[in-house]
Amino acid sequence: MTLDYDIIVIGGGHAGCEAASAAARLGSRTLLLTMDMAKLAAMSCNPAVGGVAKGQIVREIDALGGQMGRITDLTTIQFRMLNRSKGAAMWSPRAQCDKTRFSEEWRRTLENTWNLYIWQDAATELLFAPAPETNAAPSDNLPDETTTSFNSAPGTISSAAESDADSDPTLRNAPSAAGKLAIRGVRTRMGVEFSCRKVILTSGTFLGGVMHCGASHAEGGRAGDAASHGITESLRAIGFETGRMKTGTPARLDARTIDFEILEPQYGDENPAKFSFSPETKPIKEQLPCFLVYTSKEVHDILRTGFDKSPLFNGTICGIGPRYCPSIEDKLRTFADKDQHQLFLEPEGSSTNEYYLNGFSSSLPWEVQWKALHKIRGFEDLHIFRPGYAIEYDYFPPTQLHHSLETKLVSGLYFAGQVNGTTGYEEAAAQGLIAGINAHRAMKGESPVVLKRDEAYIGVLIDDLVTKGVDEPYRMFTSRAEYRILLRQDNADIRLTPLGYKIGLISQKQYDHFTKKNTLVESLISFAREQSVKAAEINDYLKSVDSEPLSQGRKLYDILMRNNVTFDSLQNTLPKLRKFIAANEITPEAIEEAEIQIKYKGYIEREKFIAEKLRRLENIRIPENFDFHSMNALTIEARQKLSRIRPETIGQASRIPGVSPADVNVLLVKFGR
């Protein structure tokens, strides 16, 4: 057994599994360090993948060659395409998964990946060495000074300036906080020292994790798992800013004690789709339902009796929680006028009685949770497997990263997932994939993969983190993307599969499948452009779909731009169309893609024009280590923000909060229009 690797990934969650898989498949000798091999990519919270904007991210991961979409398809127990009633830019796939099988499939995938090795242990210390200037990869732009120190009160950001450097053993690895460092290895709890060239930190909620349930507090990364100590201290000692965040999870319920007969079922799609573009996975045939339940005034009154013992309200929890996934006690305080809240009862698998109560996350005392749950209709005889709890953990403000996800302070060290202040399996997996790709490419002296905001939701995610930072757990929404008509879930393969193939994560077989689909889409669009349709042969159809009849013949392409007119419904009316689709074996996926491109042509072209116009700013680079304080024409706030975040382009600078359009014009004058 060797103790030397190209890349070490710390943490076996969704980010770590994608990072390790990508790095190893690309050719780097990779070690995945995890505290429990039986819980790889564990679904620690809800047993689902996807959702609004998140589903688009999963399809992008798949299009680039990541694993999450494929493994989701293999373990799906219900599939729904959300927002079908809205425009195609808003369609978002979501799947309930069998959480046990999901983790098992990930383990099977990783154990069968050549060049990937797993070691069960806890990383406790990162090892550093001075970074030779010649080792700097294109993304290794290290700052001359360490980051500014912030107030280190509980729950706030702090840095090495406040730590006792003399007594901290990690400083034996670092010449000084201001020095340029490179990663050289990892030391574990068992005392094993691994050497490497790159490290990807994906430790989720485990760094300094503390769980809260009423007056009960315990260290841990999640229920049943120990917290991780040493890494945060190791990084703070050399100048990294750190902070605390909080998340939570609801009680798990025993299905045998629930009266499903009186609950409102929520079924999956009649014709379910899937996440992966690969033909090797198939849509699910037999689905399990979810159920809708509701709280009541009586439930709320019981919950309020525990507010004085809530760690969220009595000052015990200092970490910042997710705004868009609040606990039930948060909801009651924020929406005090509401007499009920909708909850979703979701199965955790096809062979378990365990159910997840989505919307009832709580850190109230367990007995308060118990009493309140029993007052929900259908839960009168309820047994719970475990109560809900909150968890606080360390994170690192992501403005300390390059867009490659490599840290600015340490060459060869990458962060991905919740350590960057994000929340959600999908956001974590996307970061892990990009970090794995870029760590490998840096090993080879190749430029990093940086997705732009008009290329992928993943690009929006990373740019938001690196440029704007976070002041609460970050989750993706379609509203965060300026170009969401370009970034649809249906065209993720068109946008990203050529890149995945060029990188080396998409196989020739997968790429051939992609090009075949693309050819079918283009051929159907061409047919629609060329095919003339007489008014007499289509007017009855148009009336049936409440569309204005034709006064003269039109091209099929123009007719398809109308609302309610679809390729599928036209096939019975236009035999030539039906024959063309059958003769060319055009798949339903290709038909849908062609139809969307036709209907949204004007919107797509407009967004492309705007994106190209703004991309000019992305091509104007700012010299690294430029002294923004020397530019008196900039506002003081802009000088401070630019000096701290150190944007690499004027485009990035323009998105920093506190940098005004006037400041951007000053930068344009300085660095060229």
Describe every region a protein language model picked out:
Residues 3-5, 189-198:
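Core beta-strand elements of the Rossmann-like FAD/NAD(P) dinucleotide-binding domain
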Residues 36-38, 232-370, 467-540, 544-552, ...:
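An anion/pyrophosphate-binding glycine-rich loop and adjacent beta-alpha core
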Residues 2-15:
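Beta1/beta-strand and adjacent pyrophosphate-binding region of the FAD-binding site
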Residues 21-125, 129, 190, 202-222, ...:
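Conserved N-terminal/central alpha/beta ligand/cofactor-binding core
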Residues 480, 486, 497-502, 506-665, ...:
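Extended, charge-enriched "interface" segments that sit outside catalytic cores
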Residues 10, 193-204:
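Short hydrophobic core segments
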Residues 127-131, 178-192:
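Conserved beta-strand-loop-beta-strand element in the redox core of flavoprotein oxidoreductases
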Residues 356-422, 450-463, 587-641, 646:
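A glycine-rich dinucleotide-binding beta-alpha-beta segment and adjacent secondary-structure elements
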